[in-house]
Regions:
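Helix-turn-helix DNA-binding elements, focusing on the entry/boundary residues of the two helices
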Residues: 10
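Short aromatic/basic micro-patch
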Residues: 7, 51-52
Length: 66
């Protein structure tokens, strides 16, 4: 039986984009502070951990790829 997660961590998003987790964190910081950024995804926080909705990440990847 396979369980598909509804949320992605920084590491998962980085893997999908071919970037590093620190790049994802940096983009989140820039977005939060109104600076120029490329990663246009809104994180949800579970406790203090930023998580990204899987469907939104996949839509972003498709938009960037095509």
């Amino acid at each position: 039986m396979s369980v598909e997660l509804a949320f992605y961590s920084d590491k998962d998003v980085a893997r999908r984009l071919g970037m590093s987790p620190s790049w994802v964190r940096g983009q989140r910081h820039k977005r939060k502070h109104g600076q120029k950024h490329l990663l246009d995804l809104e994180p949800r926080y579970i406790g203090t951990c930023a998580r990204y909705v899987r469907a939104e990440v996949e839509a972003f990847v498709a938009k960037v790829a095509g």
